[in-house]
Amino acid sequence: MSDTVVSLASSQAPDAVRQDIRHDWTLAEIQAIHDMPLLDLVHRAGTVHRAHNDPADIQRAALLSIKTGGCPEDCAYCPQSAHHKGANLPRERLMPVDAVLKEAAAAKANGAHRFCMGAAWRKPKDGPEFDAVLEMVRGVRGLGMEACVTLGMLTQSQAQRLAEAGLTSYNHNLDTGPEFYGDIISTRTYDDRLQTLEHVRQAGIGVCCGGIVGMGERVRDRAEMLLVLANHAPHPESVPINALVAVEGTPLEDRPPIDPLDLVRMCATARIVMPKARVRLSAGRKSLTREAQILCFLAGANSIFYGERLLTTANNEADADAELLRDIGVPVPEVTLAAAE
C-alpha cells in the first residue's frame, strides 16, 4: 500500500473534492482508500458525500420479485437458480400487471420513491411477457415513481423499448471483481454483463450496478469491482452494496456473516470514488444493528430498500425503517402499508 496515496486521500481539501469526479482511478488508489483507518475513511467519505449530496436525502426503494425461481444461471449465492435444487424455492410465473401495480401503489403510499421489479430470467424473450413488463414500467411511472427493472441480459432493441416505456434505471450487478467472478458464476461472463450495461447506457437509461460482499472474495476483489464501476463514464446512477445472505441449499450456504464494518468500508469507498452515485445499502441490511446502519449513512450510503422482502430474502420491517430514518432526521410519511390497501 502506498502511504502517499493514503495521505492524499485523507488530506485533499473540500473545495478540490467538489470538482473531483474522476474516471481514471487505479486499483492501488482504491485499495488504499478502502484500507484507511476506519475513522479517517468515514470522515473522508462523509466530506465527499456532503460536498455532492444532501445528507438528509435517503432514497427509499421497494423491490418486488415479479417472476420467481427457475433461473438457468448458476450464480452460487442465488436460491432462484434452477441449479440449486436444495434451495426448494417454488417456481412462479410472471405476475399479472395489475397485481404488480397494486404493490407499487402500496409502496408509494408507504414512502417509497422508486419501485424495482426483478424477474429470474437469463434474458427476457420478446413477446407477451416482455410486453407485460413494459406495461408495468409505464404503470409505475404513471404513479409518479421511479421505475427500475432487473431482467438479465438485454439486447439493444430491448433496452430501447424499455427507455421508450419510461424506465428510470436498469439493475445489472457485476457481483464481484473480474478475477473472482469465475468462482461464483459460470453461465454468464463478465463481458456479458458489461455488454448489457453498455446497451442500457446507449438507450439513455440510468445504470444501477453494484455487487455482493462476503462470498469468499479478497479485499482486492472488492476493490477491482469498484474500479470497474468508478472508471465507467458516467458513473452508475446507483450502486447497490449487498452483504451475502447465505441461503440453505445454495453453494454459499455455509459462508459466515461478514463483519458489519466491511459494509461500512465498502459504502465509504464507493462514495469517495463515485461522489454523486446513489450508494444503496441493500441485501443483508437486516443483520445490521441500527448503529451499524447509521454508520453506513455517515459513510455515504444514501439509499435503502424499503419493505419486508428483497426478492426472496427477508428485509427490515417498514415500520422499523421509518423509525430509524426519523430518528436521524429524514422525513418519512406517517403512512403504513396496511393503510394503503
UniProtKB/Swiss-Prot annotation:
InterPro entries assigned to the protein according to its UniProt record, in alphabetical order: Aldolase_TIM (IPR013785), BATS_dom (IPR010722), Biotin_synth/BioAB (IPR002684), Biotin_synthase (IPR024177), Elp3/MiaA/NifB-like_rSAM (IPR006638), rSAM (IPR007197)
Pfam family, one: BATS
Enzyme class: transferase
UniProt pathway: Cofactor biosynthesis; biotin biosynthesis; biotin from 7,8-diaminononanoate: step 2/2
Positions that bind [4Fe-4S] cluster: 71, 75, 78
Reaction(s) this enzyme catalyzes, per UniProt: (4R,5S)-dethiobiotin + (sulfur carrier)-SH + 2 reduced [2Fe-2S]-[ferredoxin] + 2 S-adenosyl-L-methionine = (sulfur carrier)-H + biotin + 2 5'-deoxyadenosine + 2 L-methionine + 2 oxidized [2Fe-2S]-[ferredoxin]
Protein's UniProt name: Biotin synthase
